[in-house]
Amino acid sequence: MAAQGFLLIVTFLLVLMVLARPLGSGLARLINDIPLPGTTGVERVLFRVLGVSGLEMNWKQYLSAILGLNMLGLAVLFFMLLGQHYLPLNPQQLPGLSWDLALNTAVSFVTNTNWQSYSGETTLSYFSQMAGLTVQNFLSAASGIAVIFALIRAFTRQSMSTLGNAWVDLLRITLWVLAPVALLIALFFIQQGALQNFLPYQSVTTVEGAQQLLPMGPVASQEAIKMLGTNGGGFFNANSSHPFENPTALTNFVQMLAIFVIPTALCFAFGEVAGERRQGRMLLWAMSVIFVICVGVVMWAEVQGNPHLLALGADSSINMEGKESRFGVLVSSLFAVVTTAASCGAVIAMHDSFTALGGMVPMWLMQIGEVVFGGVGSGLYGMMLFVLLAVFIAGLMIGRTPEYLGKKIDVREMKLTALAILVTPTLVLMGAALAMMTDAGRSAMLNPGPHGFSEVLYAVSSAANNNGSAFAGLSANSPFWNCLLAFCMFVGRFGVIIPVMAIAGSLVSKKSQPASSGTLPTHGPLFVGLLIGTVLLVGALTFIPALALGPVAEYLS
């Protein structure tokens, strides 16, 4: 079992790096404002039709464009969900959503969280799934990538005030990165057996002679961008454990690769644009070390079996509760870490049924900000915040003004960095406390004791960090939970983007200083260790007390 797990991890990472390297080169061209070959004419026509000037923006203008697009998308999606019974492509005549569920769902998909307090096949029409959720899957992913484009330019430009044009970046990211790759993945999913149709639900006779209603729909097209954009919201309630979404072991492997390929490619792109590929490799080493350790811990915990079943005398040599027999324990463990290290949240197993330690690792990966590869764009700009913090700590230790890529990190940048890092922990801890203090919060818990608290802590951690996965024992479709989680998702997304863009605006105006004998190298194993230590230290200091009340207490009980 150990050899199989090791081979699975190594194979996954090797294939990932092979795919991400050329994609990173293409992203580097876009960051450097170099059109991809053969796209100039199409872009010129589109820019003219859409009225995009192409003039570069300062950080406030860039941020305003990103926020404006997302707020417009939020309003459109909210009213679309409220009135879906008036809209076409609704063969099951599904009614509109309640105001609180519509608000929660709209915020969820606009913020790239894709938390779902509903069952897709019984709640949403084909039109809502396609024109509403799938569109936001593209736009939210493009928004995250555009923000990291701006931040990378801030590190590599000197004495400037502009960070690029947000509309140009969003169009290029959507047209030349997300759309073509998602199309290829969708076609592959269809070939493997995923659904893609507009048929009414089909009534079939099972082998036992009973009648069953099989849901239909345009699944493959949504599934592709759901994984590629690290969105995670499933067409069906069972998400990627449903055979209509994820029909084979091969599609499952491709889904895991799709989650990580853009975050990995962005690290390569960062190294290329910075003119020092070692900087990108340093980030990948730090992410990979944490990732491999976390996968190993989850695999170890799940192959030990469920101690509660063992205590009852049941056969539990491995913990198969809540897992697809098609995939097994090792693949389910790898998928769980992939989906929570990134801001994806898609699942092929029920995280609520993992062992105490097996469920704690995905929860902790979200709580540290999903900086281990992370979401498209958001993972890298989250890790860059920890890079700045690590540089600052190192500067204090050696008595020098901290600098990164030749740019001095001053008080303003550190205040903004601290603010951005503290946004999500504050939301998680205060949100969990509020839920536990109120009857409306506690009544949603399926389980009592430490595991019930873990369900609450996981839900708020998932929402605040824009992941979207859940310990499904929590009955979250209530006005209290829909509003609480919507607030956490909204502030967790834009409360980080705003200070990140402010940091970019500050850094882009600075000159790069040449390296000297006293400059801290930020590309070697020493800095990789310092960066990992910073991530672990912040995560440990912030969340160990809360984790001790949940999964740790459950493990020890």
From Swiss-Prot:
Keywords: Cell inner membrane, Cell membrane, Ion transport, Membrane, Potassium, Potassium transport, Transmembrane, Transmembrane helix, Transport. It is a multi-pass membrane protein. Disulfide bonds: none annotated. Its main location: membrane. One of its GO terms (cellular component) is plasma membrane. NCBIfam families: kdpA (TIGR00680). The system is composed of three essential subunits: KdpA, KdpB and KdpC. This is Potassium-transporting ATPase potassium-binding subunit. The gene is kdpA.
